[in-house]
Amino acid sequence: MSILIPNKDQAETLDKCLKSIEKLTDYENYEIIIIENNSTEEKTFEYYEQICNDKIRVVYWEKDFNYSAINNFGAKQAKGDYLLLLNNDMEVISRDWLTELLSTCQRKEVGAVGARLYYPDDTVQHAGIIIGIGGVAGSVFVGMKRGYTGYMHRAAIQQDLSAVTAACMMMKRSVFEEVGGLEEELKVAFNDVDLCLRIREKGHLIVYDPYVELYHYESKTRGAEDTKEKVRRFQGEIEYMRSHWIDILKNGDPAYNPNLSLKKWDYSLKVN
């Protein structure tokens, strides 16, 4: 099992992530690969020296930020038969998280597994992704209080979906390689959705597992879409998805009822 964590500076954030893994992981046969991406703070490299051991190693990506390319690079360095993509701004909060992910991912028909993620204020950040929400794809139950189960208890039930976020996503290595990894044209947005859709095209299931829970301090490293260049890049990624996945965007997500709204995240009824 190989855990891939891209990182740029933010040593404190990464440290919180790694300590939570160490504290709350009951499955021991794993390695952690930190994919270093152009950090500038000296304390970051000092931190790397402190943490490297038999389980943790650092590899260096020296090109511009491209989430897809960075993780594809990390996957090539990995030794495990299973790959876990994990953001550096995550904090594990369920003890059997890795065992749970692995037990689901080992099912023959499963290609990838995602988790239930919360913001630090204990509201939902991710409980699965529906194609079409927000125009291309969006997370459901965003902002719902932790403990609430949502429409038909969907937030609390393990289920097959069309996509889950790569902020915490486990895959069989063989499946990742079968589909050619992440699409590097999608540098930041929708690369996880595109990956999941390609995995589904090959006949594998995408599973949302609510029993795996983590906090997500979202976009601490990447930042917001707050410049003209970032806005242009984001628009290009939207156009990529609309051109490559026109059928599912036109016909609707097979994991979502067509009578429900794509304008809201809470499974509200569509109102014409």
Regions found by a protein language model. Give the residues of each.
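Acidic donor-binding segment of Leloir-type glycosyltransferases
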Residues: 22-63
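Conserved donor NDP-sugar-binding/catalytic core segment of glycosyltransferases
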Residues: 90-136
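C-terminal, non-catalytic tails of nucleotide-sugar-dependent glycosyltransferases
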Residues: 1, 111, 121, 133-160, ...
